[in-house]
From Swiss-Prot:
Its main location: endoplasmic reticulum. Belongs to the synaptobrevin family. This is Vesicle-trafficking protein SEC22b. GO terms for molecular function: SNAP receptor activity. Component of 2 distinct SNARE complexes. The gene is sec22b. It comes from Xenopus tropicalis (Western clawed frog). Residues 134-194 form the v-SNARE coiled-coil homology domain. GO terms for cellular component: endoplasmic reticulum membrane; endoplasmic reticulum-Golgi intermediate compartment membrane; Golgi apparatus; melanosome. The lineage of its organism: Eukaryota, Metazoa, Chordata, Craniata, Vertebrata. Pfam families: Longin (PF13774), Synaptobrevin (PF00957).
Length: 215
């Protein structure tokens, strides 16, 4: 289930729009997650990963950054990641069309709170079981969600570590892995060439031996 949706400006973390689950029981628990979302917005910058999943106990944050705006959703951990990012892509398309040009100029929090109407309507379509089945089958153009970086929300917030730093670590690991594969390929090539050279030397020596000793 989609429990909380927030949209914020990346440059300064200013909340632009939000929508929270109306259920009272969920509402009592969601304040903590809403505070975490606001803290997260303040840590984002231009170097932050554009797509990220942050685990938060029984819940999971997913966010998407497009054109300087962060679209964030809080879901139950069992909610499919692919649907969560399809939902965020949907919000981005509509929000950018309606308010994209005004985002850099606003200074008041929740300047686009009326966008909640669209959020509510879209959220229902992703929660409905039949709609979810349809979305799962038609949303083939969405990028491979398995490649999206995953981190823990409390570790990010408590350590005070910017998401750009986490992204840098992930990039470094990827670079090291690539270098390891290249080195392994190079060593395999050297080994192959050495074997071929040994065969060539043996062949030449054999020819010389036969020519001078048997002819």
């Amino acid at each position: 289930m989609v429990l909380l949706t927030m949209i914020a400006r990346v440059a300064d973390g200013l909340p632009l729009a939000a929508s929270m689950q109306e259920d009272e029981q969920s509402g009592r628990d969601l304040q903590q997650y809403q505070n975490q979302a606001k803290q997260l917005f303040r840590k984002l910058n231009e170097q932050s990963p554009t797509r990220c999943t942050l685990e938060a106990g029984a819940m999971t944050f997913h966010y998407l950054i497009e054109k300087g705006v962060c679209y964030l959703v809080l879901c139950e951990a069992a909610f499919p990641k692919k649907l969560a990012f399809a939902y965020l892509e949907d919000l981005f398309s509509e929000f950018d069309e309606q308010h994209g040009k005004k985002v850099p100029t606003v200074s008041r929090p929740y300047s686009f709170i009326e966008f909640d109407n669209y959020i509510q309507k879209t959220k229902k379509s992703y929660i409905d079981s039949r709609a979810r089945r349809n979305l799962s089958s038609v949303n083939t153009e969405l990028q491979d969600v398995q490649r999206i970086m995953v981190a823990n929300i409390e570790e990010v917030l408590l350590r005070g570590e910017a998401l750009s730093a986490l992204d840098s670590k992930a990039s470094n690991l990827s670079t090291l892995s690539k270098k390891y594969r290249q080195d392994a390929k190079y060593l395999n090539m050297r080994s192959t060439y050495a074997k071929l050279a040994a065969v060539a030397v043996f062949s030449v020596m054999l020819i010389v031996y036969i020519r001078f000793w048997w002819l």
